[in-house]
């Protein structure tokens, strides 16, 4: 094999500047394991006060509230990297291993398995430097390393005697939608997106790889194509060969000892038939649950490699992922079933299923869902498997003996979200790729005396863990229990057993007890950190210098969010509230599902297959336990959904035009409805209905959404001002009040604080602040105020910085039943605590391990009868920044700007138009670093450098928009 055809001299010259081929020692972060005897003696607290990040005892707290105490030695892979998969070099004397990454400038990192030193950050010779979610393997002789790159390449790299990579060839494996079958008359065609929607012409999304015994062929799974492809390694350069259809969304491939039979795990299960209920996933119709829309089949394809023919298809648990052979059996990790399917390879039949259930659960209802097994390493000599549990930050030690009644022997604590595990038999160690490592903590934005953490500063790691002796495994298991707060017995006990005859209180002691709160409103907003909005509130732990959307002290003296600042004067100020998510795609999942399921989370940060965000449209992104709204619906509660999990909008104006009205037209209609003077034709001042109210037609393929959604409320669309959204809601709310039919749960997606719409960032924040303020105003002045609670949260905090952690975000609870005019609440809470609080009030069962162990937000609710003043209504204040600022002729006043500032502003306004053109309807489709700089500069008058930087940078330095069609926000 020669890689010369894939590079040229200029590439080689530039490559030396970006390649780090020298030894790079650990930085000292988590370089050694912690003492379990000290930590395991601790007890989880129901209402902890710690902040995310490093703790005084050497542990770390990550953004979902888990404690991280990884065993063994930790390999620091550097800033902004996700560790996805790991491969051990079979040449023992090299003592090296390779890590496949995402989100970095290199695809692969090579490290020393003895010392943990990173030896090489490898950047490919071709134009594609991306990694992938899975797919890395050495040839049997250790001379080649094959790995997938999610920009439609499979790369074959030469390995030298020291284990370093020297040369490579990239094989382009094109996207091909001819392997997708469509059934136009099958459900849910009547209200979902057409078959083939969301298929990306940008990439085939290569994943799992394997090599033939003789090294003549490589085999790669093309996840979006739903195919297996052969690559001829004897050709110069290597070339793609036969491609065949397997199951939906193939994940991993292993080759049997006979060298001719391959097994492929298919996360999306079998191909759909016309009789199946289907939900789209990246263009493919997935066999789905007819209520919540999640995938309901998982399969393994058996392939004869010489003929490239599928011999049979084996049904497994849900979302089968990692696999490993054990004797005459194949072990398959079922990520969404918390099980391992044991397949007899002689008959290709599942002989038994190993249960990896977590040691917690609602009494009488079985174990809690959500271990997330995804990778398996086998010690055949000792009949033990080591299984990575993505959602437990642990490796399960599993007894493979056929008669084992309690197969899980214990658990080993590793770092955040383990995605791959390999057994190094020579060193008797486990090599574990930790997808999220220690969280997004080591931000480069702490330079120059300013700390500004952001969710995108991923710090994936590798754990090198000595195989534990039986005497140490018990202590490790106890540590895992503590780290995940599975010891919070009071939270588990309060998740059931309620008595409907108990005296009602606002926040019931048990789920099932009655509540005084009959109406829950959940408002979801977009992408802000705590410091951006509330960093200037003296009572909280904020950094005023980062409060660019605050009371005006950091934004030219004009208050941007006056209503939010009034809320936290009367209602609880939560200065330790976190969004576990990195961005919108996993953010809405955390809110609605209490977790971000593996198939969704593992795509981060490239999001090639899909980007569900708050929009529906991907069966693989949903857990089979459903959503917060579907739980309420299943319980028989009336529900209304405004915007969340809606797939698309169509438009039809009263004059018959299908063109979407402009931002200005929507805004003028809103002003007319509200009785303002800015009334354009055809409305008149004081109109009683919105002229464009029936222009919008929203759709969702999820029945649990479609049957409860408000059809004329828009999904994500920055071309629509939030005032128009609120006016639509006001009409609906007034009708429900008059009819006495206000539902038990209303969910509203009010999203213009996302920015990059037509107005300036300050105007969009002001629009959002006013919109939510008006909703609170309407509810508090209504007859149902005395039985209502309003929960407000961001889906994520990605478009800003925070001096504590990039995931810290503003959260609010507005109700007569919360503590008012009280002290700041420093309790550590996350979105999942808010979800659990809603479940506690409405009597909804927890969906998984995360909301099961989450504490209801009891520190914020009044004990006993609230004071009479708590029931007084709250009145919003008007915006102080024109909401149309930046639209049309309403430009920003730059008369006092210097020529240099005017030049900077002009360049950045042009850049904003460039990155947002045609993307108003797609969450996070712009490069976040560019957006964050734009928002910062616009809010600080182009006079303050972005946190961690020395100067105000011109827009010309930002030439990295997200690739077209990949659904990426990076």
Range-by-range predicted roles:
Residues 42-505:
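Predominantly soluble domains enriched in secretory-pathway, periplasmic, or organellar proteins
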Residues 37-40, 889:
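An exposure/low-complexity boundary signal
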Residues 1-22:
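N-terminal secretory signal peptides that target proteins for export/translocation
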Residues 475-970:
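N-terminal pro-sequences and low-complexity stem/linker regions of secreted or lumenal proteins
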Residues 25-37:
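Bacterial N-terminal signal peptides
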